[in-house]
C-alpha cells in the first residue's frame, strides 16, 4: 500500500553539552546525535524517503552555539532561521513544491 502523503525527514541539531544534564536528569551528547542521525539517514535511504542531514554541518559551524536556546537543546530564532534557509535551498523540497 502506497502512502498518499509526501514525507521528508530532516536530521538532528547539535546540543550544548555544557548545559547537561537537561532538567537535572537527561544527558544529551553530540556524539550520540551524530550516531542517531546516521541511523535515521540509513532508514530513509532504505525507504526511499528524502533526508536532509543537518547535524555535521551545524556542529562544524562555530556560530551554532548561538543558534541554541538557553536550555542548550532547542533552537532559538536564529537556529530556526538557519534551518529555514537550508530547507529553502533543499533540492528534494524544491522538486516537490514545483511538481
Positions of PLM-derived features:
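A short helix->loop->beta-strand "cap" motif at the edges of active sites that frequently abuts
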Residues: 1-7, 49
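Alpha/beta-hydrolase-fold catalytic nucleophile elbow
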Residues: 10-11
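Short acidic/His/Gly/Ser-rich catalytic and metal-binding motifs that mark active-site loops
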Residues: 16-20, 59-65
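Substrate-gating cap/lid alpha-helix
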Residues: 17-54
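Short low-complexity, flexible loop/linker segments enriched in glycine and/or proline
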Residues: 23-24, 66-69
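Histidine-centered active-site loop/cap adjacent to the catalytic His
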Residues: 38, 47-50, 69-99
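A general structural signal for short secondary-structure boundary/capping elements
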Residues: 55-56, 78
Amino acid at each position: 500500500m502506497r502512502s498518499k502523503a509526501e514525507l521528508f525527514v530532516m536530521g538532528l541539531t547539535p546540543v550544548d553539552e555544557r548545559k547537561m544534564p537537561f532538567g537535572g536528569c537527561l544527558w544529551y551528547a553530540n556524539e550520540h546525535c551524530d550516531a542517531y542521525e546516521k541511523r535515521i539517514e540509513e532508514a530513509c535511504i532504505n525507504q526511499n524517503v528524502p533526508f536532509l542531514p543537518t547535524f555535521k554541518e551545524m556542529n562544524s559551524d562555530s556560530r551554532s552555539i548561538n543558534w541554541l536556546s538557553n536550555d542548550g537543546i532547542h533552537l532559538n530564532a536564529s537556529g530556526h532561521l538557519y534551518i529555514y534557509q537550508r530547507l529553502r535551498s533543499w533540492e528534494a523540497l524544491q522538486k516537490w513544491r514545483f511538481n
